[in-house]
Every structure is written in structure tokens, then in C-alpha cells.
Amino acid sequence: NFDWWIKRFKRQFELVDILRLDHFRALSGFWRIDGKSKNAKEGTWVESPGKELLHSLKDFLNVKILPIIAEDLGIINQEVTDLRRDFSLPGMKILQFAFDGNEDNPYLPKNIVENNCVVYTGTHDNSTTISWWNDLDENIKENINKNCNLSKDTSWALIQLGMRTKAKLF
């Protein structure tokens, strides 16, 4: 009945209006590793009851749309995307991931066509924007400047770039 999860979400929603659910991917499936395994390579993907959990949470909160942002980064398959879309949860777009020179990169601002997402300059797993910028190869910096005219204040330029995307939230 997801009692532990429901209590945890209930408490969080007493503190905040919206949650970013880290590792949302695990609500579709997770990598199970036997406790006796010597490394994580020996695991298998296992389907998880995320859909049932999200339905239970919606019922408990009595809402049409859950106030959750899905961290849909990493190994994301169609099942994860479908789960996020089935519950109208916004996903995440990270500008620091955008500028690898691939014109089809889904994080490139011009390729953010879905508005049900949140654009971030980076995440808690990344360096700060200025540290990220300072550590970049000059070729990548040139590629970024092709996509946006960065001023001396890189952080603000990326914020402005993110705010110009079609994303609902920044």
C-alpha cells in the first residue's frame, strides 16, 4: 500500500510546494544487484511498481497532477518517458549537457520542444556553472558561443538562455 512512501511524501509536501524526485528512472525499473555480487555489473533490470505508487500518491493528495519534477537523466528508455508523460510530470533539461557539438542534442535550447520540463543550468551532481565554464575546452566554449552570445557573466547568460526556451519552468 506504499504506506512508507506516502508518509514520506506527505511530510515533504508540508515543507515544500513541489518536489524534484531524484532517480525517477527507478520508478519504471531499477538495477538489482545480488548482495553477494563482487561488482554492480552482475545485476539485472527489474520492473518496479512506480505507476501504482504514483496513482496511490495522487489519490492520497487528491490532485489531478502531482507536484513533482521527474529527474529523467541517465539511462532513460521509452518506459521511463511514458511513465513521466502518463502522469504529466515535467522532466529536466540541463544546459551543461547541451553543448557537445551534436546539433540533435536534446538539451540544446533550440531542441527543447516540449514545454512540460524544467531547464537548469546544472544539477547538484555537476560543478557550479562558473567552474564548469572555466574547465571547458576552448572548442566547446566556441560551440556554446555559436548557440548563445555569452557575455563575461557566463552564469547570467546561461540563465537568460534557459529562460528563452519553451520550458514551462526554469
Question: Which role does the model predict for each range below?
Answer:
Residues N1-L169:
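Alpha-amylase-like alpha-glycosidases and glucanotransferases acting on alpha-linked glucans and related
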